[in-house]
Amino acid sequence: MGLLWCAVMAMAVALAFAHPKQPSTYHPDDVTYPGSVTVFTVPAAFPTSVFSSYYVKPGPTNQPQPVIYDPVLNITFPFNLTDPKHVPDSNDDPVIFPQPIANISDATGEAIASAAVSEISRIFKSNNAGGSTTCSKCIAALAVGQMVARLAPTHFPSGMVSLCHSLKFSTYSSCELTYGPNGSGASWAQILAKADVAGLDGKYICSYLHKNVCQYPTVTSVKAVFPKPKPKKPAEPRRSGKKVKVLHLSDLHLDPRYSVGSEANCTSYMCCRYSEPPANGTVPEISVSAPLFGYYKCDSPFYLALAALQSIGPLTGTSAKNPPAFSLYTGDLIAHDDENQASRAYVEATEVAIWETFKAYIGGPIYTALGNHDTTPADYEAPHAIDNHSTLGSQFSWNYAHVSSLWAHYNWLPSSVAQQASTHYAAYAVSPPHHPNLKIITLNSDLYYQHNPFALLNASNPDYSGMFSFLITELQAAEDAGQRVWIVAHIPTGWDGGSALPNSADYFYQIVERYSPHVIANIFFGHSHEDQATIYYRNNGTAQTREEALVTGWVGPSLTPLQNLNSGYRMYEVDTGSWEVMEAFTFYSDVGSYTNLSSSVDGEGDGGQGEGPVFKLEYSTRATYGPAVNWPSDAPLNATFWHGVTEAMERNRTLAELFTQYQGKSSAKSKKCETEECTKAKICYMRSGSTALGKQCKQGYGSVQ
């Protein structure tokens, strides 16, 4: 039945989008689906054998609480780390301040901070005489704050909390949560102490702190320097005719504190978390009871994570014994916890829990790029150069050492590559087993993320972290060796321009243009939680045509439903000579159906009756879009193909509506794209590989959430 449905759907797409003059050279009926089925119903029972023991066993009214042993740290994480009924509001992690430039008493430091708060309040409350603007006031305030950060850094967080509230940036509780001792106040002391507040850093910082204070800076292009010029006639990569399967997972956001039966439709972020009953004994009203397998406003519970993993084999035709050639994970393992609820141990435990399950179900190496939530505080990564690899520059090395050691432990990386990752922000370059003609280069994209305040330092230098120098070195070595390259990162550099710093995205675009299409075959991202594709062109996208299209950025759909999305993942069929994508299959599960599943599991959760979630083939990229662009059946799904898709959208708006449907993984809650303005914006996003290009598009249509 599932195969028949997919064939009918593919034929319908062909009829709807066929070119009016030329017959398609591609026939959807020729699609060979990768798995034994196109629809798979996951067993309701939780597969308890995936973990050796449990603090709390899985059941119809609770998520499991597995005992997680860390093979690298040689520790067992305690139950109270993830106990859903006792979520912590603080941690014992090191609090790192910049070294003060003078030796002053605590009382003097407190007085300096108090005086600074008064002065900054005066600056903002003064009138605009003399041509002062809100932005210039903010820059002046930063100079005062910098004095506190340099002289009395330990008093800096309390000052930020006070100003955040008094200037009405947010509520006091939110200000305390963000900038207090258990938030990011110490990190902001580091940033202000090191920033060029009177220059570009200051403008970025003010824009970061409040979007209405300073206009967001536009791109200031810095010319990238390469070891060698681009070859005038580079050798064209040859296809082998042999294809392998590659799995692409992204943004699981496992929530080990997910509480079944809690409020799933809450008004505060995030839902499906336990809340204490009122002291008067009344039963709180719950509008939507958190289902066992997850909900639209919640991150992934264990039940959903394991359900998705169980579906991969039947749907893709792979298994632990017959694995994909390799798999990609484009970041974000950790749930969207508030800053005071996270800790280093919480991050480490989640990393182990997820990769243990991946190891059990997927097999083969899994190449991971860290996401902005794969650290604590979330979004924060400091460049080593902030203090020449000293205390501040190495403050996140605990995580780089941990993940790289785990990757070596699971035999996903050779020890030499794991060592490279431990000293390069968890970024590395590796060739998969049996495929020396391909090099995979992963990046830590937090270092160019708009919401990482450390990335705002030395803003005029797009490679302050050295991440792009690392990328150029590896790409040049690949070019010299005749290798193909896949770049794997979390944060997309383009689309609507809302994620990557403008200068960094521009610099990355220059690198892509220099080494494409003869070296870089594909780029893979995550982060948006949505199914998207972006095209990079020659000459910084000034001429967006089929002839100028160079390479595609594939954005993988998320496993988490957050927010208002279905759960999904993708599998590619790839030629082992050119490492071009020849086919892409995307799979999903309807999260809206989960409210009917909770009661079907027995009391122990290890031998349940009934059915769990249904995962199914959502679409074949070739069958869906190929007829619309008359794409030959043996041609790769490359940048030229995707540019053709955007041209087809210009001719037929219905294709943009279909793309938007798939963007949210066919979620009933996703926004639709039914206007000409939306269609034009969507096409513009797809043709925008940098922040500057994306910002030129009509805003407001980038996300379906």
Model-derived segments and spans:
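Fungal secretory targeting signals
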Residues: 1-22
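Active-site neighborhood of phospho(di)ester-bond hydrolases with catalytic His/Asp-centered motifs
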Residues: 248-250, 325-332, 365-372, 486-490, ...
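Active-site environment of divalent metal-dependent phosphoester hydrolases
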Residues: 256, 335-338, 368-379, 449-450, ...
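Acidic, His- and aromatic-enriched active-site or binding-groove loops in soluble protein domains
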Residues: 349-361, 389-413, 509, 513, ...
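Short, surface-exposed basic-aromatic patches at helix termini and helix-loop junctions that form
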Residues: 358-360, 503-517, 536-549, 573-574
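Active-site-proximal segments of metal-dependent phosphoesterases and phosphodiesterases across multiple
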Residues: 449-469, 473-524, 535
